[in-house]
């Protein structure tokens, strides 16, 4: 009888650890910082009735490890983290779920059901809407720093094409960093081709702004945050990931310019001559900034 009871307790503990790890996995794959992941996992462990003094959590970029041990027993479980993206809504909902589970004393089935809803929830915006907003965000940045409205439109078009190209490459199973390089190459080629159209009085501003969507702002912030919070291993891994993303972007841009720029065009001098001072009235810039910020937030996942 005791053996049966012990076996049931072990199965229950394994289920609790599984729910705990699935919670941490969702947070890690949604680009939460390590401190937030640890804080939420400990809160969920408290809801699950796991004593904090017996709980040991190890968080890595690609692996989560949880151990519950006392003087006689030790149970460990691992969870692989494979797909890293940005989903701020998922992070927010998991945090609210952990508090709600404690306050309303959720059953394990209820908590698992709510967790699955968060994991399977579709984004509020379709991929093409996100791509359009990303284009407007980069176009708004171009407009804020001296570009005209035609340059804004050119930047938006180039960014849209590059954003969808990167998404398609990832869907086809191409390496993430190679996908970034391909999209940066295509963006730069399009922007350079538009510079000969004569449509814009600031033809080289789109070259500088069309690949801004690739800049890994969230990974960079998480890297700094993790290093400050003394999560050194995860922080260094995030830093390496950030460097690889920037390297892929730089390679794509440099390769495009090396391949396309004609010998009689000194592109470095063209860039050094660019004016970054806005030439619009203040009321125009008053609309530029919210447009840039709103579209940037959509493409980064704040409202997704």
Residue ranges and their predicted role:
Residues 1-109:
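Soluble N-terminal domains of membrane-associated systems
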């Amino acid at each position: 009888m005791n053996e049966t009871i012990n076996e049931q307790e072990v199965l229950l503990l394994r289920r609790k650890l599984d729910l705990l790890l699935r919670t941490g996995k969702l947070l890690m794959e949604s680009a939460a910082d390590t401190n937030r992941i640890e804080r939420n996992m400990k809160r969920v462990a408290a809801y699950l009735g796991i004593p904090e003094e017996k709980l040991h959590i190890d968080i890595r970029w690609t692996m989560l490890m949880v151990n519950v041990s006392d003087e006689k027993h030790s149970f460990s479980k691992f969870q692989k983290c494979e797909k890293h993206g940005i989903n701020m809504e998922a992070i927010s909902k998991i945090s609210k779920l952990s508090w709600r589970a404690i306050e309303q004393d959720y059953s394990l089935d209820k908590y698992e059901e709510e967790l699955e809803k968060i994991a399977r929830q579709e984004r509020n915006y379709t991929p093409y809407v996100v791509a359009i907003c990303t284009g407007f965000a980069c176009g708004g940045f171009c407009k804020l720093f001296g570009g005209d409205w035609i340059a804004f439109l050119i930047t938006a078009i180039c960014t849209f094409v590059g954003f969808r190209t990167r998404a398609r490459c990832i869907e086809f199973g191409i390496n993430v960093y190679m996908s970034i390089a391909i999209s940066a190459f295509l963006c730069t080629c399009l922007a350079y081709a538009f510079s000969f159209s004569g449509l814009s009085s600031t033809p080289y501003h789109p070259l500088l702004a069309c690949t801004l969507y690739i800049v890994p702002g969230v990974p960079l912030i998480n890297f700094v945050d993790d290093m400050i919070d003394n999560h050194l291993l995860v922080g260094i891994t995030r830093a390496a990931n950030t460097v690889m993303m920037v390297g892929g972007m730089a390679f794509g841009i440099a390769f495009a310019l090396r391949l396309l720029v004609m010998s009689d065009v000194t592109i470095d001098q063209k860039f050094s001559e660019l004016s970054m001072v806005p030439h619009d009235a203040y009321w125009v810039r008053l609309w530029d900034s919210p447009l840039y910020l709103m579209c940037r937030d959509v493409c980064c996942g704040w409202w997704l």
